A protein has these predicted regions:
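A recurrent flexible, glycine/aromatic-enriched loop bordering the glycosyltransferase active site
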Residues: 59-78, 94-95
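A short, conserved alpha-helix in the catalytic core of glycosyltransferases
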Residues: 76-78, 82-87, 93-119
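Short beta-strand-to-loop acidic/aromatic patch adjacent to the donor-nucleotide binding site
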Residues: 1-7
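Nucleotide-sugar donor-binding loop of glycosyltransferases
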Residues: 3, 32, 117
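Active-site donor/metal-binding and catalytic loop motifs
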Residues: 109-133, 139-146
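Short, hinge-like loop/turn segments at secondary-structure boundaries
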Residues: 44-49, 131-134
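Non-catalytic, C-terminal membrane-associated alpha-helical segments of glycosyltransferases
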Residues: 135-141, 145, 149-198
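Conserved donor NDP-sugar-binding/catalytic core segment of glycosyltransferases
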Residues: 11-43
Length: 198
């Protein structure tokens, strides 16, 4: 799976994405995403897509909580036989987060997902506050439609991410990010809350 807004960063992007599946290290894989803009998204990408690869399985759910189902189909691969066996997306239509839905099915059914840090793509957005609100409104709708995901803890993922973003923005003297951080987070929070009430 590759979305239309992804830019390939490395020539070995595809081979590095597929080889772990071919070698039976995992059953699904996804690429490292790098933002080429200087917004909050840049630091969120750094946190969510580090430079070290990792594999997640059912055994990691207790430690990771909801983050065990983190997966991005912006640049990803799934074994065909596994995708067919699991009936893919079950014919459902999602407002967003369809990648989390399939990741949940993979992990719960005993399959492994690998994050491939050496498969790099550029994937960037510059959302206005209104667009950010809409994005998280749709995310809230997704969680309302798939309430079983609310059984998994978020742990400290949100607060850790906020600390990371502010720390990195301060290090780089990125004042625009620091000034816009609070309204950006409010747009996300309110959007999510309203979406869950949809």
């Amino acid at each position: 799976f590759v979305t239309q807004d992804v830019i390939i960063k490395r020539k070995d992007w595809l081979s590095n994405l597929l080889q772990p599946i071919i070698d039976n290290e995992c059953d699904a894989s996804y690429s490292r995403q790098i933002s080429n803009n200087n917004t909050i998204e840049k630091y969120i990408r750094e946190s969510n897509y580090p430079n070290i690869s990792s594999i997640v399985s059912k055994a990691d759910i207790n430690a990771l909580g909801l983050k065990a189902f983190f997966f991005s189909d912006a640049s990803s691969a799934i074994k065909r036989e596994v995708f067919v066996k699991l009936n893919g997306y079950d014919g459902k239509k999602f407002p967003t987060n369809e990648d989390m839905y399939i990741a949940y099915k993979l992990i719960i059914n005993g399959y492994r997902i690998k994050y491939c840090a050496d498969s790099e793509v550029i994937h960037s957005h510059k959302f206005t506050f209104k667009q950010q609100y809409k994005r998280y409104y749709d995310t809230g709708r997704f969680f309302k439609q798939n309430k079983f995901l609310n059984n998994y803890k978020v742990n400290k993922a949100g607060s850790n991410l906020a600390k990371y973003v502010l720390k990195r923005a301060w290090q780089e003297k990125n004042w625009s990010v620091i000034v816009n951080f609070l309204p950006n987070m409010i747009a996300r929070y309110v959007g999510m809350k309203m979406g869950k009430k949809f």
